[in-house]
Design a protein with these regions (language model features):
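Beta-strand-rich receptor-binding modules of extracellular spikes/adhesins
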Residues: 1-14
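Glycine-anchored, exposed beta-strand/edge motif detector
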Residues: 16-161
C-alpha cells in the first residue's frame, strides 16, 4: 500500500483479481517484470530478446543482425528504464508502459510489432509488420494510448519468405 514491496517466501494464493493500473505519467509501468543483465546499452521502451549468452539485447525482426528474433529466440518484452551495457535491466514481460519521449505517437487500438529496424537509434515497437523476405513477424503488444502500450508478446514468430 505504501509503494514498497512484500516478499512471500512460500506460495501465494490469490482468490480475487490482480489489477494492473494504467498511468499517464511518463515512465510509469505496471505488470509482470523480470530482471536480466543487459548485453548492450538499452533505453526505456526498447524491445528485447534473450541472446545465447543469457543477456538481453535489442530485438529486431530483420533476420540478419545479432539481435534478430527467430522462432527459437523471440522477443520477450520491453525495457522499462535505461540501462548501461552489462548491468541489471528490468524487462516488462506483460503489462502497461507509458513513455512519451521514446515512443512514437501510436494509433490507439493498433497491434504493435517487433521493429524491423531501429528508429532514431531506438528499438521500440512499431505499427507496421515487417514485410521483407527473411524478416520475422512477432506481435509484441497493443497501443492503448498515443504513448502507452500493453505489452503482451505473442511467441508465434513467422518468417517471411
Amino acid at each position: 500500500a505504501d509503494g514498497g514491496s512484500t516478499t512471500f517466501p512460500q506460495q501465494l494464493t490469490i482468490t480475487k483479481n490482480i489489477a494492473l493500473t494504467q498511468s499517464d505519467s511518463d515512465g510509469d509501468y505496471s505488470g509482470v517484470t523480470a530482471v536480466f543483465t543487459s548485453g548492450e546499452a538499452l533505453e526505456a521502451g526498447e524491445v528485447v530478446s534473450i541472446h545465447t549468452d543469457g543477456e538481453v539485447y535489442k530485438a529486431l525482426a530483420d533476420g540478419t543482425t545479432s539481435g534478430a528474433i527467430n522462432a527459437d529466440q523471440p522477443a520477450i518484452g520491453v525495457v522499462v528504464a535505461d540501462a548501461a551495457d552489462d548491468s541489471d535491466v528490468i524487462v516488462l514481460l506483460q503489462g502497461f508502459l507509458t513513455h512519451n519521449a521514446n515512443f512514437p505517437t501510436y494509433t490507439v487500438g493498433a497491434t504493435l510489432y517487433v521493429p524491423e529496424a531501429e528508429t532514431s537509434s531506438k528499438c521500440v515497437p512499431e505499427l507496421d509488420a515487417p514485410d521483407s523476405s527473411g524478416d520475422f513477424i512477432q506481435v509484441i503488444g497493443y497501443a492503448v494510448h498515443a504513448n502507452r502500450i500493453f505489452v503482451n508478446p505473442d511467441f508465434t514468430v513467422i518468417e517471411i519468405t
